[in-house]
Amino acid sequence: AEVVFPASATLACNEIFGGIDWKKKRTVYVSPFEHNATMRSLFLYQKRYGFLITELALDEKGMELDQEKIRFQFMREKPDLVVMSHVSNVTGYILPVEEIAASAKEYEAIVVVDGAQALGLVPISLKNSPIDFYVFAGHKTLYGPFGIGGFIYHSKYRLKHMIAGGTGSDSLNLEMPEEGTVGYEPGSPNIV
C-alpha cells in the first residue's frame, strides 16, 4: 500500500473517481450514509459518464446496512464500484466495510472507503483487506490541520492521472511518472 496526499479528502475522492476508466464501469453502489463531499464528486462523474448509482440496502429499521440484502443486490446487478463511509458523520454508525468489500470483491469491484470520520479513531488494517482506496482527512479524527488529506492506495487497479505537473523527479519526461504515488501528487504542497 502507498499513501497519496492531495490537499483534502474531497480532492482525494475526485482523484480516485476521475482516475477510473468508466468505459467498462456501469454500476456503482453507495451507502446511504455518504458525506456530500463524496456524493457530489461521484455525481459529477455520473453526469459525465452516465453510470447507475444504487444505494446499498438497509435493514428493516433503516438504521444499518443489511449484508444479506446487499449480497442479493450484487447478484442481481454486478457491482463495478462500491463506495462507503467507514463511519457516518451524522449518526456515528460504523459500517461493516470489510465484510461488504469482501462481497464486492467476489465480482471484482473497486472498493472505495471514506475514512474521514474514522482514521485515527476506528481500528483498520489494510494489509489483507479487500478495500482498494481508503480516503482520509487530516483535520478530523487525525486532529491535524486543514489542507491535508489523502488516500491509501491499496489496489492493483491503476488510476489514470487527473492532474499533470511538476513532481521534482524525471523532469525531462513529459508523461507523469507511473511508478509509486509521485504521479498523483504534482506541484508543491503546503508545508508548515
Tell me the role of every PLM-derived stretch.
Residues 1-192:
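Pyridoxal 5′-phosphate
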